[in-house]
């Protein structure tokens, strides 16, 4: 399972559009859930106003361990090479410095990196406000099983996120979610500025092709 998120919102650089094409749907499960963040932030402003303003005012920092090589089978399997478009540690370190990251190299070749402060809530050019982040995914599934989600995400000032409010936000997002039940040959275009997406659990072979547009 991959939890709801805006693609690469845990980085300073992210795509504007996502294109999906179903080559082969899973035997069971495997839907792509989508949730409009403008609708979500409207609900959150009504039910959790202090949480929304904290995300907007303080921003968010993410900490994530990236493998040396891509792992397509994992929702968190994007390597540091792919993330930073670097072929070497030295190149990666240069790119991280440009983007404001701090990081530690691990003995297995993986990289544990912490982002600069990134937005939790954005105002789009058309006036809409969106819950633009990877908060739900980071809190629900970035770290290893059993690890506190506080290791994966915090407010920009280092303060822990209020767990009760995070889980309430997750619940509201799920209420607003629509599942794309894939059929062979089906295509979907997602506006990454407005819409979060994820992946439901599945069994069997599932081939959904994806392309990211800057």
What do these predicted ranges mean?
Residues 2-4, 13-214:
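Active-site environment of non-heme Fe oxygenases that use a 2-His-1-carboxylate facial triad
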